[in-house]
Amino acid sequence: MFISFEGTEGVGKTTLIRKIHQHFEEQGKQVVLTREPGGTPLAEQIRSMLLAVNHDENMSHDTELLLIYAARAQHLQQVILPALESNKIVLSDRFTDASFAYQCSGRGLSQDKLQLLNQNFVSRMPEVTFWLDAPIELGMNRARERGALDRFEQEKLSFFTKVREGYETLWKAEPERIKRLDATQSPDQVFEQALQYLA
């Protein structure tokens, strides 16, 4: 089983992933916990490039998208597909839906570009995607409490509003796969809501 976790900054994805990871392990199941961008040594190097705040050069939106997919291709081949072939459960902090929400809805890139990349480099989609949804202001306040903000977290409120709208578009288009979780609830309540979809 392949499960991805999506949402804007500070909505509690990491906390939920840890809880679900523990839940499956207590059932004696083998679980792989991973993230995007990242998940392999090479993909983590790309992640560092993507998140770094570079005052000397602005990263173009196309470059950002291509770097994310370079990391994703490596991640799929090295981690996700081998784990699924071994009948392990894969829990991924973000996957292709993040690219639609952030790069297409947020940045305004063409969906055709994303579709082309998905067709050529993404051979497996999650069976279940949890979208943790909360007001942008709430999530950003939580993100600020964590400390220094990365390149994405420093974006304006209007950007994250578009990202959230992108996630909502996906959720309405694919309600069977994408499950919206109310991230204004406590971590335990979010976990209980998620478990209902995994029963």
Curated annotation (Swiss-Prot):
Q: Which GO terms describe its cellular component?
A: cytosol
What family is this? Belongs to the thymidylate kinase family.
| Catalytic activity line of the entry | dTMP + ATP = dTDP + ADP
Q: Where does ATP bind?
A: G7, T8, E9, G10, V11, G12, K13, T14
User: What's an example GO BP annotation here?
Assistant: dUDP biosynthetic process
Question: Which top-level enzyme class is recorded in the Swiss-Prot or TrEMBL entry?
Answer: transferase
Its source organism is Acinetobacter baumannii (strain SDF)
* A molecular function (GO) term: ATP binding
Keyword Nucleotide-binding recorded: yes
Q: Which domain of life is it from?
A: Bacteria
Keyword Transferase carried by entry: yes
Keyword set for this entry?
ATP-binding, Kinase, Nucleotide biosynthesis, Nucleotide-binding, Transferase
Entry's EC annotation: 2.7.4.9
InterPro entries in the cross-refs: P-loop_NTPase, Thymidylate_kin-like_dom, Thymidylate_kinase
Task: Report the protein's function.
Answer: Phosphorylation of dTMP to form dTDP in both de novo and salvage pathways of dTTP synthesis.
Task: Write down what this protein is called.
Answer: Thymidylate kinase
